[in-house]
Amino acid sequence: MKITVLVENSTSCRLYGEHGLSVYIEYDGKKYLLDTGASTLFAKNAKELGISLADIDTAFLSHAHYDHSGGFEAFFKENDKAEVYMQDTSAENCYFRTETGDKYIGIPVQLLEAYKERFHTLHTVCEVEKGVWAVPHSTENLDGMGRRAHMYRKVGDEFIADDFAHEQSIVFETEKGLVIFNSCSHGGIANIVREVQNAFAGKKIYAVIGGFHMMKLSGLDTL
């Protein structure tokens, strides 16, 4: 397995950075993309690194936020074959709510409709390719974490605390053990590890990679 971060919130003199994440993964002779960051910067960085987006076989959307889905239109322009797997609860309805107002933080509006033939939805633990699994949340009452983070979903005219049912982990089986990718871990990294342990009973976890959203936080409840 080879992992290359295409974009994140830190950078070098050669590459661009932004608030968001995109990861390129080579595994068992195939090429995978996890998220596309917030814009086209992931594609610019891929070109600088000599990575061809056209050669990617399969892609994943970790969850329904703009900073992980904002570059998919650029990806589709360069790649005409890869299917994108997401949870069936993913929609264009995520908001950040504070006393000063509501800010839309979801998937770019109308992206899912415009490219509906490229997006495929899942709703349970699923082996997408040999040794590559999508694992949704199974922990209950995660809406409390959404409420604390001021994150909500708009359902009709009502705002509901986000329980992050649209978030999924991508798990690769390797000789050393399971490698878990979760781009933001909104559902709590401890919950995520436990969910994977339950889904793969008896299998060793070798690594957990992604974003944990733990900066400036304290206390075990943030895990």
Regions found by a protein language model. Name each.
Residues 82-123:
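Hydrophobic alpha-helical segments and helix pairs
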Residues 70-79, 103, 218-223:
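Metal-dependent catalytic neighborhoods of phosphoester/phosphodiester hydrolases
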Residues 41-92, 198-209:
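Active-site metal-binding motif and surrounding structural segment of the metallo-beta-lactamase
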Residues 13, 41, 65-69, 91-94, ...:
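Active-site environment of divalent metal-dependent phosphoester hydrolases
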